[in-house]
Amino acid sequence: MNKQIFVLYFNIFLIFLGIGLVIPVLPVYLKDLGLTGSDLGLLVAAFALSQMIISPFGGTLADKLGKKLIICIGLILFSVSEFMFAVGHNFSVLMLSRVIGGMSAGMVMPGVTGLIADISPSHQKAKNFGYMSAIINSGFILGPGIGGFMAEVSHRMPFYFAGALGILAFIMSIVLIHDPKKSTTSGFQKLEPQLLTKINWKVFITPVILTLVLSFGLSAFETLYSLYTADKVNYSPKDISIAITGGGIFGALFQIYFFDKFMKYFSELTFIAWSLLYSVVVLILLVFANGYWSIMLISFVVFIGFDMIRPAITNYFSNIAGERQGFAGGLNSTFTSMGNFIGPLIAGALFDVHIEAPIYMAIGVSLAGVVIVLIEKQHRAKLKEQNM
């Protein structure tokens, strides 16, 4: 494997490992500072909004100033963010930490993806991006597991460790990464407004609505999950880490071994509908579960439906996009970010009203998604009849 690509993969792994590390300790951390579910929602939303705003600028600066420089700046910001959260004793410091963290993600991700595109031969580009996705998932899966055990020593330790990982990634980037002589910068063209009139906007309405609605519901549930289990059955950081890591492993296994097989027998819309119904059933079981082991077992399988929906929607976008793959990818990313910003805000406020309220909201949103899919399938059937 190319040495630079290995370093880029390692950087991405460290960043997402660092993000995952802190998930199990958030409930203890927030209670220690006397913060609420609404506060957690604000912290998560601040990260998402900051990343959404900075990402376009991060990509542009990476093209103009060099991707290595932007990656290194992003890694330093990541470490600063984690250290600030580790020493923070009031909400203002934590909020500033999350804003800086979002900025770091908005710089590192465009820089890394752009550099991988620059240094990858055309026949290996898709494979290299596939590896990047798998490495991101690996960081998310291993992070909570490691963070939960670190929290047995101190609930601030995972934040210090994440910050140290950022510094390590920064040093490796300085020493081992080099900007290529030829980059993809010249491949970016100036937006021509007349091209927008050639796009069939109607075909994107359903996937855009689905993306917004589902990212809204899923982020609302996932944001509050650690706090939910801690309050409902008194899960410790170690328990939360086992639940989330187990759920991540099961979700990844289903993505790797079963997603392609399901796609051979179902259309994307049909598969999304069934995945949503599966999620509704599991979420209802979660509402009625009150024991340690029942919630642990549900935690292992609750994320499967969500993990299957995401690639199905991406695949659906891609299939209807035709030659507008970049445009479709941009729409998908934009409306996912919007849902990730709005969802935690509302879920946090609902959690303070009733512990089960965010779950009810996720159930309602999932059912709304099923209705949207059914309406779209019916509309497609009518169009097919008219064209016959």
Swiss-Prot record:
Cellular component annotations (GO), alphabetically ordered: plasma membrane
Record has Plastid as a keyword: no
Any coiled-coil regions, as ranges: none
Keywords of this entry: Cell membrane, Membrane, Transmembrane, Transmembrane helix, Transport
Compartments, as annotated in UniProt: Cell membrane
Membrane-spanning residues: 5-25, 42-62, 69-89, 99-119, 129-149, 157-177, 201-221, 239-259, 269-289, 293-313, 331-351, 355-375
Gene3D superfamilies in the record: MFS general substrate transporter like domains
The name this protein goes by in its record: Quinolone resistance protein NorA
Species classification: Bacteria, Bacillati, Bacillota, Bacilli, Bacillales
PROSITE patterns in alphabetical order: MFS (PS50850)
Outcome of mutating D352A: No quinolone resistance
Main location: membrane
GO MF terms held by the record: xenobiotic transmembrane transporter activity
Sequence similarity: Belongs to the major facilitator superfamily. TCR/Tet family.
Keyword Transmembrane helix: yes
NCBIfam families noted in UniProt: 2_A_01_02
Membrane topology, record value: Multi-pass membrane protein
Protein purpose: Involved in quinolone resistance. May constitute a membrane-associated active efflux pump of hydrophilic quinolones.
Organism: Staphylococcus aureus
CDD domains in the record: MFS_MdtG_SLC18_like
InterPro entries found in the cross-reference section: MFS (IPR011701), MFS_dom (IPR020846), MFS_Efflux_Transporters (IPR050189), MFS_trans_sf (IPR036259), Multidrug-R (IPR004734), Tet-R_TetA/multi-R_MdtG-like (IPR001958)
Any matching Pfam family: MFS_1
